[in-house]
């Protein structure tokens, strides 16, 4: 950062008085912040649009996955009536939602009993139109995963849970 001659001269004179120098420096920074701050608190070239229901809390899951499919047509996420500031409830499932971007259609396509607030159900796209998520087979008392195809609206059951998938 470059300082002008006046700023350097003042800084040199104040080296003998570190307490005063610190106070003046903070005041100078505050004045410059107020003088040059932007007139807005948030600026975006995009429109922000809510896609979940007002009465529910919605979330996707972990940061390493994208909720948007490769064709940018669909967004997947989990939705719940539970306050996500509290512990998940074992007997209460989360809804699995597919949002169709082209026609603004919000569709609950399933539910899952195996989730947490940080990673969700490990919901993730495995190709352009299919995603996978974890669930519980209550009759067999077994963790499973399910693959949902948004084009043919069909679910395939995999008899083990997943943590991650690759495109191979």
Each model region followed by its residue ranges:
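Sequence signature of WD/YWTD-type beta-propeller architectures
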Residues: 1-168
């Amino acid at each position: 950062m470059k300082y002008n001659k006046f700023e350097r001269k003042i800084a040199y004179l104040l080296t003998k008085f570190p307490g005063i120098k610190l106070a003046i420096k903070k005041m100078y920074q505050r004045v410059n912040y107020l003088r040059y701050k932007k007139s807005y608190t948030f600026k975006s070239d995009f429109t922000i649009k809510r896609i979940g229901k007002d009465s529910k809390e919605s979330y996707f899951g972990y940061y390493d996955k994208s909720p948007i499919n490769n064709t940018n047509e669909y967004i997947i996420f989990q939705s719940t009536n539970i306050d996500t500031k509290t512990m998940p409830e074992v007997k209460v499932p989360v809804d699995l939602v597919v949002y169709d971007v082209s026609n603004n259609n919000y569709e609950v396509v399933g539910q899952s009993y195996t989730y947490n607030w940080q990673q969700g159900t490990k919901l993730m796209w495995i190709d352009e139109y299919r995603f996978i998520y974890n669930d519980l087979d209550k009759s067999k008392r077994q963790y499973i995963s399910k693959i949902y195809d948004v084009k043919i609206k069909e679910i395939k059951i995999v008899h083990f849970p997943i943590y991650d998938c690759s495109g191979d």
